[in-house]
């Protein structure tokens, strides 16, 4: 079938109307991609959003429409946007339309070499039902809101409380310990963070560019001629970026582009064997925000707080694809920006419904200098049950929560009347709760250059032992400061002994 061509009729920012005047040809289908070849030879991709009239389609551009004019030829591809898949995507960086942005050349994505970004979620009978805990080495997460393998995890927090650092630490810990493949979708976040992440992954060996390149990088260079393409195939991560400076069309689709690569590895298509994949999204709120911009540009009536009326539908269509099947699993970690620290805002509230575990980052805890600034009372996990975790873990987690809840209730009394007015029992509870609160912090590998402290991974057995010792009163003699930013309880005891000796 010959490809259908049309002409640009109207351009309003990223929204482009295209007229197809041939009588017999079919209009492109919804979500099909159209291509415009610019004067400099570069290709601008449009995605069909709606049919208006008999011969006109309204599309959203995946790149800037600067310099575009009416009357330019548009080619209908007959397919949705395609992403390259296969072993060659290991260690590579792509944009929303599957073009390489790492300077190492494009990969083929036509026919069998690619997959469309719009796909159906797996059928119900293909889903996996087993529950297995995924330990991260981060005490507060493993103890109080444990993550499940193949589950969906949300990191909620306002601006600047540490979502991206926590995601980077999770990539570092899980990707190293888990040895599987990671796919990272950067959705509408800072380009600088994407650059930092790539360097971090190269230094930790999750992405491999070869020894020659690493020597040039250590000397301050970035010589892509030295990249070893064969060694690169041993990499354990793939990146897909659509950052803050991209038009809303790209930001609204880049999460789907990353997900398509993750689905390919989960299903084992072409390789015969499915894999366990980690899928990181930073930031899922920007996906909603871009959808809201596109919706307004397309002239749809806004709903609550100015969001698109299709908010729940769009979120559901994406989240239902992030799932585990009998072939393999996708464990997803999604950072969720919380506008004005309001968890009832429609964007974070819609995301909540899809998650198995939520890690809520709190500004109040960050202000105390406790990092990661996870709020143990607001954070939840579906698998925090004795059946899955065992009695010892479950009982310890519940005791920690009860103690912190008691401390929270007493804070108003302390603020008004002071500590002296509390009973002896409550004074003891407060002093232990403050130690527990500080011991929930730990130094991160990815923050070593800021803290000057070596990052640690803490085994769950050591975590449980440490918190039980604090709550049983075995460590009441040590000052609170001894417990801050420590890994195991032995480190805290050592620091406490030192402080006591100095006094």
Curated annotation (Swiss-Prot):
Enzyme's top EC category: translocase
Gene3D superfamilies per record: 2.40.10.170, Bovine Mitochondrial F1-atpase, Atp Synthase Beta Chain, Chain D, domain 3, P-loop containing nucleotide triphosphate hydrolases
Binding residue positions for ATP: 157-164
GO CC entries: plasma membrane; proton-transporting ATP synthase complex
Protein name, UniProt field: ATP synthase subunit beta
Assigned keywords, A-Z: ATP synthesis, ATP-binding, Cell membrane, CF(1), Hydrogen ion transport, Ion transport, Membrane, Nucleotide-binding, Translocase, Transport
Function: Produces ATP from ADP in the presence of a proton gradient across the membrane. The catalytic sites are hosted primarily by the beta subunits.
Assembly and binders: F-type ATPases have 2 components, CF(1) - the catalytic core - and CF(0) - the membrane proton channel. CF(1) has five subunits: alpha(3), beta(3), gamma(1), delta(1), epsilon(1). CF(0) has three main subunits: a(1), b(2) and c(9-12). The alpha and beta chains form an alternating ring which encloses part of the gamma chain. CF(1) is attached to CF(0) by a central stalk formed by the gamma and epsilon chains, while a peripheral stalk is formed by the delta and b chains.
Cross-referenced PANTHER family: ATP SYNTHASE, ATP SYNTHASE SUBUNIT BETA, MITOCHONDRIAL
Coiled-coil zones: none
EC number, as in UniProt: 7.1.2.2
A GO MF label: ATP binding
Superkingdom classification of source: Bacteria
Family recorded in the similarity comment: Belongs to the ATPase alpha/beta chains family.
Main localization of the protein described in the UniProt heading: membrane
A Pfam family that the UniProt record links to this protein: ATP-synt_VA_C
Source organism of the structure: Christiangramia forsetii (strain DSM 17595 / CGMCC 1.15422 / KT0803) (Gramella forsetii)
Membrane topology: Peripheral membrane protein
InterPro entries registered for this protein in UniProt: AAA+_ATPase, ATP-synt_VA_C, ATP_synth_F1_bsu, ATPase_a/bsu_AS, ATPase_alpha/beta_chains, ATPase_F1/V1/A1_a/bsu_N, ATPase_F1/V1/A1_a/bsu_N_sf, ATPase_F1/V1/A1_a/bsu_nucl-bd
Subcellular location: Cell membrane
Catalytic activity entry: ATP + H2O + 4 H(+)(in) = ADP + phosphate + 5 H(+)(out)
